[in-house]
Design a protein with these regions (language model features):
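Extended beta-strand/beta-hairpin segments
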Residues: 1-53, 61-133
Length: 133
């Protein structure tokens, strides 16, 4: 993503449950909610579900992009993530599985290294400014 591109998301309560929302972003419509155990109706993913999905999606796409650039025989990439809040620290764990019988051990290792360079991960690890108006 270029540095000057602005992405806008619009979120509106739907009334389906106490926390249910409709999400419009970049021409896509999504639903969000909290699980019933948190007072929601579980009509869609919760905010941290979306955060994990964003990190996983970006990771898979970054690995695929790199394999394409290198013309490596990557058949499929899978990303499994967990999130846990420990005190004031958010801990994420990513498990990357790269499939491809013709990939060398060196290529597999490089793809795992590249997985840590996805833009969403860099955003989460970097300096972020949020302005509320």
């Amino acid at each position: 993503m270029s540095e000057d591109k602005v992405i806008t998301a619009h979120i509106t309560e739907t009334g389906q449950s106490a926390y249910a929302v409709a999400i419009e972003v970049n021409g896509h419509s999504l639903k969000g909610d909290e699980p019933e155990s948190f007072g929601g109706g579980n009509t869609g993913p919760a905010p941290y579900d979306f955060l994990l999905a964003s990190l996983g999606e970006c990771t898979a796409m970054t690995v695929r992009w790199y394999a394409i650039q290198q013309k490596w025989p990557l058949e499929k990439v899978e990303v499994t993530l967990t999130h846990q809040k420990v005190g004031k620290v958010d801990k994420f764990e990513k498990t990357i599985t790269v499939h491809g019988d013709k990939l060398t051990g060196e290529q597999r290792q490089k793809l795992i290294e590249i997985a840590a360079k996805c833009p969403v991960q860099r955003t989460l690890e970097g300096k972020v400014e949020i302005t509320t108006v």
